[in-house]
Amino acid sequence: MDARLLEILVCPLCKGPLDYLKDKQELVCKADRLAFPIRDGIPVMLEEEARALAAEDVDALR
């Protein structure tokens, strides 16, 4: 994942910051508790493609 791209990407829903999970190839919005997949190096920033996270999963990221 390109570091410059990570600096400018925000959550498409709340416009908040995203955390990059390299091992899972996901971008996580803690505020909306969503994980957006990265496929073939390309972030898929569509709400319908995002994986919902449990509160415990988000807390583990803090």
UniProtKB/Swiss-Prot annotation:
<dbReference type="InterPro" id="IPR005651">
    <property type="entry name" value="Trm112-like"/>
</dbReference>
<comment type="similarity">
    <text>Belongs to the UPF0434 family.</text>
</comment>
<dbReference type="GO" id="GO:0005829">
    <property type="term" value="C:cytosol"/>
</dbReference>
<dbReference type="Pfam" id="PF03966">
    <property type="entry name" value="Trm112p"/>
</dbReference>
<protein>
    <recommendedName>
        <fullName>UPF0434 protein azo1471</fullName>
    </recommendedName>
</protein>
